[in-house]
């Protein structure tokens, strides 16, 4: 499941303010979390985030539950309508091979896997005013992500990283490098360093 935590406002020790968004992709079986800081929730950053997430995970989930954001859905899914997927997002899904599962508007329980764990990201706000710069902020976010994947998850009774090692075997293979490079949007990377990506080092073991 995918979601954004949007427009977090953070202050450094010198008073400088930094506004950022956090992308979250959480695997269903293991509850393994992939979080990244992004300056924008635009479609370009969406594709960039998901592509880097898939590469870090070593594969692609068979389906992804999404909300009705305009970067993904042209028309929201409701009780009476399937909605309409944004054509560029549909092409992205086709290129990576996953199925899109839109949430039904006004039924928030369909996103609980993402939104409950996203509360953990609010831990970063406990460091508001205590850090010196963006680099320290990113390091703290990495610590929070790794801790979340390493501690026991109440829903499954064991740390997500342990279940992820098995779930990883069932991920779809990544497409070719040309497709991945296209969606990672090197122009964004060159200008803004794009999303800052974090996942547990243990995932590569």
Each model region followed by its residue ranges:
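RNase H-like two-metal-ion nuclease catalytic core shared by retroviral integrases
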Residues: 66-67, 80, 100-122, 142
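Conserved small/polar residues in nucleotide/adenosyl-binding loops
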Residues: 198-205
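Acidic/histidine-rich, metal-coordinating catalytic segments
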Residues: 60-81
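Mobile-element integrase/transposase regions
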Residues: 1-33, 42-48, 94, 180-181, ...
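Active-site beta-loop-alpha junctions of metal-dependent nucleic acid enzymes
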Residues: 35-60, 82
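RNase H-like polynucleotidyl transferase catalytic core
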Residues: 82, 88-90, 94-111, 130-131
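Polar, glycine-rich mid-to-C-terminal structural blocks
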Residues: 124-197
């Amino acid at each position: 499941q995918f979601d954004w935590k949007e427009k977090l406002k953070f202050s450094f020790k010198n008073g400088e303010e930094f506004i950022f968004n956090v992308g979250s992709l959480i695997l269903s079986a293991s509850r393994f979390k992939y979080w990244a800081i992004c300056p924008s929730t635009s479609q370009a950053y969406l594709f960039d985030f998901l592509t880097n997430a898939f590469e870090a995970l070593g594969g692609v989930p068979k389906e992804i539950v999404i909300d009705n954001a305009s970067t993904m859905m042209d028309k929201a899914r409701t009780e009476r309508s399937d909605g309409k997927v944004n054509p560029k997002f549909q092409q992205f899904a086709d290129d990576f091979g996953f199925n899109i599962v839109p949430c039904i508007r006004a039924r928030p329980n369909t996103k609980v896997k993402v939104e409950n764990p996203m509360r953990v990201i609010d831990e970063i706000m406990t460091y508001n005013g205590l850090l010196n710069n963006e680099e320290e902020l990113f390091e703290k976010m990495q610590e929070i992500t790794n801790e979340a994947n390493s501690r026991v998850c109440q829903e499954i009774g064991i740390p997500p990283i342990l279940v992820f090692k098995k779930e990883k075997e069932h991920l779809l293979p990544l497409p070719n490098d040309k497709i991945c490079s296209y969606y990672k949007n090197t122009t964004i990377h060159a200008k803004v360093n794009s999303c800052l990506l974090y996942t547990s080092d243990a995932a590569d073991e």
